[in-house]
Curated annotation (Swiss-Prot):
In the N-terminal section; belongs to the LpxK family. This is Tetraacyldisaccharide 4'-kinase. NCBIfam families: lpxK. It is an enzyme of class 2 (transferase). HAMAP family: LpxK, UPF0434. It catalyses: a lipid A disaccharide + ATP = a lipid IVA + ADP + H(+). Its EC number is 2.7.1.130. Pathway: Glycolipid biosynthesis; lipid IV(A) biosynthesis; lipid IV(A) from (3R)-3-hydroxytetradecanoyl-[acyl-carrier-protein] and UDP-N-acetyl-alpha-D-glucosamine: step 6/6. It comes from Verminephrobacter eiseniae (strain EF01-2).
């Protein structure tokens, strides 16, 4: 089955996406047949999951995936950090899982604030540093996200919710909520790779859309705007803040090993900074191999993501954090989703609830009795381990995460997948 996993071509190392990804010119149309082959592979893989030939696994806690459908940087990691802080403010214990792109190891491990980015990946290292002081947010990386989730929950069993940094296309991890992030280039020319920037066809089903530019069309999901700006101060490796205004007039060497380095350089210049030299490197570039070729008297300035790799060898570098301003309506919508998704209480082995979940119904008394409301609080969807909603009129237990409705017969819920019916899109929107 692994042969059917689509492998899109990588972006040109270290520089902006091809210009033909933004318009449907000759180059894009020439690659269009390959894009159709890629489309077929994507559809075939998704079909294998829908048919049950490939199994998606759920870790037993609500999973929120923050991802994108375009190649290159969309600003997912700052969204994950903002989400983690928001969920903490709501009293939830948050964990973060990721693959750790660009790291030298393929094992499953915890990410600490001082973990080398080369071993855990630059984005996970950045997230761990953000939560070094204050309420802890455990971060785990693994090639398989489900392995990272299980390791995190084994080490931190009190975790209420998991955030997955990237992984919208990682269908092996069953999720409860999907957030798709777009940068200001949107859908580009709308073609799939390699003719365009899309990793999969759009529109696709997601729960929320966050967009830095115009809202992408075609999706019924609620869309909310995002504004990105540079923080007013750069940071030294020791945590000291340096106001950007103080750097005006100084010649700077700006370095960026991100998907869209030109955007970072433009934001620096918009702050009135003088860039004597700009250097764009491949995204996730191993900066341990980087050698400074410019005048060492130039102040070295970089992105916050690059700093976690640059500071061990160049502690004099300044890092400029990115500040994210998300439409408050998004957090209001997220808060409305949260109450029913809190971690469910443990179910005692041998109890009626455990028997029902296992699919062995307890013996009913001869007289009819309604379903005990207390029992509902103990039940979870057997497929996703997510919460259930009782539809009294239809006598069904609704699982939005699994898109299934389980029957309730004589007051007893029958949580068997082969007894459930699929929910329609219209029912999911209600």
């Amino acid at each position: 089955m692994g042969a059917l996993r689509p492998q899109p071509p990588r972006m040109p190392a270290g520089h902006v996406a091809p210009a033909y990804w933004q318009k449907r010119g000759l180059a894009a149309w020439a690659l269009w047949p390959l894009a159709q082959l890629y489309r077929a592979l994507v559809a075939a893989r998704r079909g294998l999951y829908r048919a049950g030939w490939l199994k998606a696994q759920h870790p037993g806690r609500p999973v929120i995936v923050v991802g994108n459908v375009i190649a290159g940087g969309a600003g997912k990691t700052p969204v994950v950090i903002a989400l983690a802080r928001h969920l903490q403010a709501r009293g939830l214990r948050v964990g973060v899982i990721a693959r750790g792109h660009g790291r030298s190891r393929r094992d499953c491990r915890a990410v600490l604030p001082d973990s080398p980015a080369s071993a855990v990946g630059d984005e996970p290292a950045l997230i761990a540093r953000h939560f070094a002081n204050g309420p802890a947010v455990p971060v785990f990386v693994a090639r398989r996200r489900i392995s990272a989730a299980r390791a995190l929950l084994a080490a931190h069993p009190d975790t209420d919710v998991l955030l997955c940094d990237d992984g919208l296309q990682h269908l092996a991890l069953r999720r409860d909520l999907e957030i798709c992030v777009f940068n200001d280039q949107g859908l580009g020319n709308g073609f799939l790779q390699p003719a365009g920037p899309l990793r999969e066809p759009w529109p696709r089903s997601v729960d929320f859309v966050l967009h830095a530019g115009a809202a992408p069309g075609g999706s019924p999901a609620p869309a909310f705007g995002v504004q990105r700006s540079l923080a007013p101060c750069a940071l030294r490796s020791d945590g000291a803040a340096v106001p950007l205004a103080r750097l005006q007039g100084q010649p700077l060497h700006a370095l960026a090993a991100v998907a869209r380095p030109g955007e970072f350089f433009a934001m620096l210049q918009a702050r009135g900074l003088t860039l004597a030299h700009t250097e764009a490197l491949p995204d996730h570039y191993d900066l341990q191999r980087w050698e400074r070729m410019t005048d060492p008297r130039l102040t070295l300035i970089c992105t916050e993501k690059d700093a976690v790799k640059l500071w061990p060898l160049h502690p004099d570098a300044l890092a400029v954090p990115l500040v994210l301003h998300i439409d408050p309506g998004f957090f209001a919508a997220l808060d409305a989703w949260l109450p029913a998704r809190r971690a469910m209480p443990e179910i005692a082995p041998g109890s009626d609830a455990a028997a029902i979940i296992a699919g062995t119904e307890p013996t009913l008394p001869e007289n009819h009795r309604p379903m005990d409301p207390k029992l509902l609080q103990l039940l979870v969807c057997p497929v996703t381990k997510g919460p259930l909603r009782y539809d009294r009129a239809a006598q069904e237990l609704i699982s939005r995460s699994a898109r299934l409705a389980y029957p309730v017969r004589d007051g007893i819920p029958v949580l068997l997948e082969n007894e459930a019916r699929p929910l329609t899109d219209e029912e999911l929107e209600q």
